[in-house]
Structure formats: structure tokens, C-alpha cells
Amino acid sequence: MALHLTLARPYAKAAFADGQKANQLEAWLAVFTAFSKIIKNKEVARQIINPKFSDKEIKTLLFDLIQTIEPESTKQLKDKIDHFLQLLIDEKRLMILPDIALVYQQLLNKYQGIIEASVTYVFPLNDEHRQQIQKQLEKRFNAEVKLKMIKDESLLGGVIIRAGNWVMDGSIKGKLTRLAENLKG
């Protein structure tokens, strides 16, 4: 995964720079999000790696799919998408499109002053608790925060909140682990 992100970074940065210059940041995001979903489809992935299909056939398949899913963004970026796909095909890097989408989203969030935070929980949080967590994080980081909710039954109870390198582990599992370490120490 880390290697794929490293490989994806220059492609995402290039598209981001182009998106800034041409005022097409959101169009690129829509395209990358759609490509990510397309590439994660097992049937499409099988066709991409199947040597029976030529590079031209693969490019046509992907372009047709992206045009169907994101017609407006594809229309705006038609030539750029064509060039981008050809570059990825030539470099044998089509399978890192989901990673390019992830890095691009991170670049866009940073540019827009948005922080993504994940809240891992066992028992679902009500809207009031979600809003309270979001407000506290926005206050702490002085930025808009997008919450991603992740269910994990291994926590036993409580929550773990992650935002960038910052982690707040308020889970029962985390407390038990820390208690066991203290008793050993």
C-alpha cells in the first residue's frame, strides 16, 4: 500500500496542478473517484490485466466507463483523461488509480483547509455525539473536519479518533492494553 501511494503521488500532484491552473479541481476529483470504483471492480480489473486485450482496448473500455459514470467531468477533461490514461497504460500503472484518487483527495482537502478524521466505534453514535466530536475536532485543528465512521467490534466499547498523525484512543480495548502494559512495567 505504501509503495502504491508513493507511485501514485506524482500522478496525483500533476493532475492537481493542472486542476488548479484550469480551475478544474472538482472535475478531476469526480474522475478519480469514478476511476477508483471502476478499477476496484473485479471484472474490470481482470480485463485490465488480461494479456488478450490490447492497450487500446483497455483504454477504450476505461474511457467509455468513465464517460458513462461521470459524463460532465469527462466532457471537461476529455483530452487530459485520454493523455492521463495513455501515460498510466504505458507505465503499467492502471491498478494504482485508486491510490491516485486517495492522494488527490488528500491534496484537495489540504488545499481547501479540510481535515479528514476517522471515528472507529463499536456501538453506533447518534447525530448529537457525531456533531459534538466534529465540533471539538474543528476547534482543536482550527479547520473544517470531515468524519469517516468505521465500525469495529473488537474495540469492546468507546471510540478511537484519528486525524492525520493525531490519535485519541478512548476504547475499552485500548484502556485494557494500556493497563496490561502498566502492570507488566
Swiss-Prot record:
One of its GO terms (cellular component) is proton-transporting ATP synthase complex. This is ATP synthase subunit delta. HAMAP family: ATP_synth_delta_bact. It is a peripheral membrane protein. One of its GO terms (molecular function) is proton-transporting ATP synthase activity, rotational mechanism. F-type ATPases have 2 components, F(1) - the catalytic core - and F(0) - the membrane proton channel. F(1) has five subunits: alpha(3), beta(3), gamma(1), delta(1), epsilon(1). F(0) has three main subunits: a(1), b(2) and c(10-14). The alpha and beta chains form an alternating ring which encloses part of the gamma chain. F(1) is attached to F(0) by a central stalk formed by the gamma and epsilon chains, while a peripheral stalk is formed by the delta and b chains. Keywords: ATP synthesis, Cell inner membrane, Cell membrane, CF(1), Hydrogen ion transport, Ion transport, Membrane, Transport. It is found in: Cell inner membrane. One of its GO terms (biological process) is proton motive force-driven ATP synthesis. Belongs to the ATPase delta chain family. It comes from Coxiella burnetii (strain RSA 493 / Nine Mile phase I). The lineage of its organism: Bacteria, Pseudomonadati, Pseudomonadota, Gammaproteobacteria, Legionellales. F(1)F(0) ATP synthase produces ATP from ADP in the presence of a proton or sodium gradient. F-type ATPases consist of two structural domains, F(1) containing the extramembraneous catalytic core and F(0) containing the membrane proton channel, linked together by a central stalk and a peripheral stalk. During catalysis, ATP synthesis in the catalytic domain of F(1) is coupled via a rotary mechanism of the central stalk subunits to proton translocation. This protein is part of the stalk that links CF(0) to CF(1). It either transmits conformational changes from CF(0) to CF(1) or is implicated in proton conduction.
